């Protein structure tokens, strides 16, 4: 659970009405732009957002800025989309969608996605490719998030017990980054030990929380099993009762993790969640579990009626009923994962591009316009990949709307980018 209360964060609880801030006129050079030598102009020069706490800025947010953003989501009743990315192209689509919707976003990498980011031609013994891919992706996000002018929580997804060396490698990278910049490379990590006994799950989470707290990082932990299949993990045959978390289990997590100084954490509590998309009626979500858990834990903590001490994560958001999504947000969900639907949207963009230009994609030379006409501009990968990105942006726009996460930044509509490089002799198509 995200430690948004004074007990869990070790900070004074913020008032429900967060102060509005105007946009400063000074140009901001963030650590990524400064370190990489990327000019910080246009959207990147935004110092703060009219509708968000002053600490929240363009680029990757960590520590107190991340907490302020998530606290704002809970207070105002929106959740932030968390999208699994496997290439720089999918990262860029997420950033574009966030700017178009005037909203923050969570970009996350799974172990398999991280390995793919590094390239399947790289050996993954001891998870070295997965570690390298995640770190490479993190630097790309840091470089480009500022340019798009949106705040990003940089996260990694399901880390089961057998994947702990992958997490250790990323933590080491964050420790080195923290020593140089005063903040971690990643904002947060997820530990998924839901298939382990509860006591072992909690013990390992406490161990990692202690290490992460020293860098102001957030830990997402999972209770109960998310069904379905994702990233090579198949839980399609799990017992139905294991898909639903009990309030008492969440309380055990709360007690253990809040004892760690500077602890920041969220809970991915199972309430019937399933990875993937299934026919209507096959998935039975019960968001009421989240509401009952809030009441139970608030009572245990002696908090006023109506308090939501837990910040929940909604796994398996693809294909979920909009009514279940809206209800879950009212019970304290501040993050919803989406992967299957964005995988489909990316592929569908390529599929539709191929269908539209099929007759221009069969040979290098020769098409309906003439046997001697070249087809280079059609099979240039930038064309089909851009179609995939645009399709993904469209799907994510729906996700932002479903999560009440539109206009959160207060910047207004995004102006259309100028993508023309100008006339050049011998230029490639742009």
Stretch-by-stretch model annotation:
Residues 1-19:
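N-terminal chloroplast transit peptides
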Residues 64-72, 88-106, 110-127, 136-149, ...:
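Alpha/beta enzyme core
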Residues 321-323, 327-383:
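A post-motif C-terminal structural segment
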Residues 162-170, 318-331:
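Catalytic cores of alpha/beta
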Residues 85, 154-160, 308-320:
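Glycine-rich beta-to-alpha transition loops that act as phosphate-gripper elements at the mouths
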Residues 37-81:
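N-terminal amphipathic alpha-helix/helix-capping segment at the start of soluble metabolic enzymes
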Residues 355-430:
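Extended, intrinsically disordered, low-complexity segments
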Residues 84, 94, 157, 219, ...:
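Divalent metal-coordination and catalytic microenvironments
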């Amino acid at each position: 659970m995200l430690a948004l209360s004074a007990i869990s964060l070790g900070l004074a609880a913020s008032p429900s009405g967060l102060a509005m801030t105007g946009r400063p006129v000074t140009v901001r050079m963030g650590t990524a732009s400064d370190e990489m030598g990327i000019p910080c102009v246009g959207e990147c020069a935004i110092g703060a957002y009219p509708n968000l706490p002053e600490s929240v800025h363009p680029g990757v947010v960590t520590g107190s800025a991340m907490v302020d953003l998530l606290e704002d989501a809970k207070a105002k009743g929106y959740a932030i989309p968390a999208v699994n990315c496997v290439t720089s192209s999918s990262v860029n689509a997420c950033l574009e969608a966030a700017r178009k919707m005037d909203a923050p976003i969570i970009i996350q990498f799974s172990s398999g996605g991280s390995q793919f980011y590094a390239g399947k031609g790289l050996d993954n013994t001891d998870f070295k490719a997965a570690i390298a891919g995640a770190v490479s992706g993190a630097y790309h996000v840091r470089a480009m998030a500022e340019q798009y002018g949106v705040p990003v929580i940089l996260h990694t997804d399901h880390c089961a017990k057998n994947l702990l060396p992958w997490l250790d490698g990323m933590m080491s990278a964050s420790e080195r980054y923290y020593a140089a910049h005063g903040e971690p490379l990643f904002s947060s990590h997820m530990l998924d030990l839901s298939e382990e006994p509860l006591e072992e799950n909690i013990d390992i989470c406490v161990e990692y929380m202690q290490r992460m707290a020293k860098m102001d990082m957030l830990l997402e932990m999972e209770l109960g099993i998310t069904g379905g299949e994702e990233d090579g993990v198949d839980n399609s045959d799990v017992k139905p009762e294991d898909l639903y978390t009990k309030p008492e289990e969440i309380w055990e997590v709360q007690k253990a993790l809040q004892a760690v100084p500077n602890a920041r954490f969220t809970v991915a509590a199972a309430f019937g969640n399933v990875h993937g998309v299934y026919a209507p009626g096959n998935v039975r979500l019960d968001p009421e579990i989240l509401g009952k858990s809030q009441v139970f834990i608030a009572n245990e903590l002696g908090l006023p009626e109506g308090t939501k001490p837990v910040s929940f994560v909604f796994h398996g958001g693809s294909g979920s009923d909009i009514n279940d999504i809206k209800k879950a947000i009212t019970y304290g969900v501040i993050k919803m994962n989406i992967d299957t639907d964005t995988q489909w949207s990316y592929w569908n963009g390529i599929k539709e591009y191929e269908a539209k230009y099929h007759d221009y994609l069969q040979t290098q030379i020769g098409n309906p316009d003439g046997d001697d006409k070249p087809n280079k501009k059609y099979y240039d990968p930038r064309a089909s990949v851009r179609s995939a990105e645009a399709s993904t942006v469209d799907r994510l726009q729906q996700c932002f709307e479903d999560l009440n996460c539109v206009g959160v930044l207060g910047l207004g509509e995004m102006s259309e980018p100028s993508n023309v490089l100008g006339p050049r002799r011998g230029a490639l198509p742009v």
